[in-house]
Curated annotation (Swiss-Prot):
It comes from Mus musculus. Ornithine decarboxylase (ODC) antizyme protein that negatively regulates ODC activity and intracellular polyamine biosynthesis and uptake in response to increased intracellular polyamine levels. Binds to ODC monomers, inhibiting the assembly of the functional ODC homodimers. Does not target the ODC monomers for degradation, which allows a protein synthesis-independent restoration of ODC activity. Involved in the translocation of AZIN2 from ER-Golgi intermediate compartment (ERGIC) to the cytosol. One of its GO terms (molecular function) is ornithine decarboxylase inhibitor activity. GO terms for cellular component: nucleus. Signal peptide: none annotated. GO terms for biological process: negative regulation of polyamine transmembrane transport; polyamine biosynthetic process; polyamine metabolic process; positive regulation of intracellular protein transport; positive regulation of protein catabolic process; viral translational frameshifting. This is Ornithine decarboxylase antizyme 2. InterPro entries: Acyl_CoA_acyltransferase, ODC_AZ, ODC_AZ_sf. The modification Phosphoserine is found at S186. Pfam families: ODC_AZ.
Length: 189
């Protein structure tokens, strides 16, 4: 997300590289007098998002993992998991990697077929390849399917995170569950 309050961002009127082109010589237009839409300018403050670049981290016959390239180091990284359930069905999960923890947002609505297999592949990858300490899932507390989600994720080994946990943000409208990964045990295997 772009911080529009950042004082280091110059107003567009003061950025020489973003000035409109003017007719320098008579004849055909060398470039348009109209400015480019702000959403198309990297770092622009338009309503659209800048297209993010992503790098392939891992790929096998079922699982593909990509990561958005960070603009600034020190910021959380966005990781995308795609698990091929069948030739035509893909289970997709977006996550944020921050401080040795992976945060996975459960999208609103019904989970797609194959979501369980995709989540299990995500957990295995997070433990074996990413070496994270925790995988957190989060979803809105007001969801109609909250009870079945709690039951399903509890069955998979997730535990409810109590308010005030140091690893999660204070969000009263969001439910967090955690899957702790004991890296000491996995290193001994």
């Amino acid at each position: 997300m772009i911080n529009t309050q950042d004082s280091s961002i110059l107003p567009l009127s003061k950025c020489p590289q973003l000035q409109c082109c003017r007719h320098i010589v008579p004849g055909p237009l060398w470039c348009s007098d109209a400015p480019h839409p702000l959403s198309k300018i990297p770092g622009g403050r338009g309503g659209g998002r800048d297209p993010s670049l992503s790098a392939l981290i891992y790929k096998d016959e079922k699982l593909t993992v990509t990561q958005d390239l960070p603009v600034n180091d020190g910021k959380p990284h966005i990781v995308h998991f795609q698990y091929e359930v069948t030739e035509v069905k893909v289970s997709s999960w977006d996550a944020v990697l921050s401080s040795q923890s992976l945060f996975v947002e459960i999208p609103d609505g019904l989970l797609a077929d194959g979501s369980k297999e995709g989540l299990l592949a995500l957990l295995e990858f997070a433990e074996e390849k990413m070496k994270v300490n925790y995988v957190f899932i989060c979803f809105r507390k007001g969801r109609e399917d909250r009870a079945p989600l709690l039951k399903t994720f509890s069955f998979l080994g997730f535990e409810i995170v109590r308010p005030g946990h140091p690893c999660v943000p204070s969000r009263p409208d969001v439910m967090f569950m955690v899957y702790p990964l004991d890296q000491n045990l996995s290193d001994e295997d």
